Amino acid sequence: MSLIKSCQTQKFEELLVRKGNAEMRIKLGVRSTKVLQILVGVLMRCWVFAGLTILACILVYWTYGKLFAFLLLCLAIIGIFYHIEDNLLFHPDMPAHSRIFVPVPSMFGMPYESVNVRSSDGTLIHLFFIRQPGPLAIRVPTVLFLHGNAGNMGHRLQNVLGLYQNLQCNVLMLEYRGYGLSQGNPTEAGLCMDAKIALDYLASRSDINHKEIIVFGRSLGGAVAIDLASQLEYAQKIWCLILENTFTSIPEMAKVLIGWRLLHYLPLFVYKNKFLSLNKIGHVTVPTLFVSGLADNLVPPRMMSELHQKCGSNNKQLLQFEVGTHNETWTSPGYYHSLATFLRDARVRRGIDPPSSPPPPSFNESV
């Protein structure tokens, strides 16, 4: 009998090992595919420079030998990746026509203003301001919504409808430079600049409650939001910060997505866009809610935990949703109720009176 059990145990262990090996092969295959896609994308965008580099390496190899040719190749690869990092990080053309057609809030029954402002470097930036009806607008919070790295702000309108209805708030949607109908080209410095002008725009309006401005950032937008809230001049204008499925830094994300051991040894100056959120989050002191989808297959949920742990706010909370994916955590049951609860508690802790109009009696989580 014991011999039979021993055989069964051995077979079970063998199955586990096979399963583990299969999963490892799948992961390695996926990672190799991602790396190959990146390399092909680089060559397609820089084929002239890549061709000249190969020719130069051949000439150097003939003239000076292998070592100098190898060094030249390494420098060329670093240079190529540095100059096309914007194309690897920012995807304003996904899906197609995202720079031409931007869905508008009225398609979801929300009244809005289409606003154009100039960023501090003169770049024209497009905004949607979605306002609660009548005098209610000045008594409720206003959310500055910072979206992720692909598409345009119109692609987030269903989520914004949920915020508008369930949190009973105004919403200012920012279209980064180079996205949608905004001018310019996206860069780390440019996006952070655009967020500042959007917050300044809210501060200039006389028809909203300046004491309850919430900055919401998802994914790349979370990194922009952290930069904004980490600076005292702008933190003074922010009541609460909500971060969803964002990352600790671009170098750390590169290690996760590409998986090359070499990336662990590269100096920071190699990265054109850094978004060093983990270094900045310690300077964030406003009430901060970290919303993490545990089914996120792009940004590891541990990064949200690291940001939460290092955050400098005395009022911070990590909210985790088991079924939350990278872009769709907002569809998780209880999502809006949890956000509303955090804001209510923040209001109580600061002694702020609630809006005179009562909140909706129930939350429409299907929105």
PLM segments and residue spans:
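An N-terminal hydrophobic leader/cap segment in hydrolases
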Residues: 2, 7, 11, 68-118
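C-terminal catalytic histidine-bearing segment of alpha/beta-hydrolase fold enzymes
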Residues: 4-12, 305-309, 313-367
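Membrane-embedded segments
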Residues: 120-201
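Short alpha-helix in the alpha/beta-hydrolase fold that links the catalytic acid
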Residues: 159, 277, 286, 300-309, ...
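Active-site nucleophile loop of the alpha/beta-hydrolase fold
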Residues: 176, 242-252, 270-276, 324
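Primarily recognizes the serine-hydrolase "nucleophile elbow" in alpha/beta-hydrolase
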Residues: 201-255
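Short beta-strand/loop motif that positions the catalytic acidic residue
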Residues: 283-285, 290-292, 296
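Acidic catalytic loop of the alpha/beta-hydrolase fold
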Residues: 295-299, 326-328
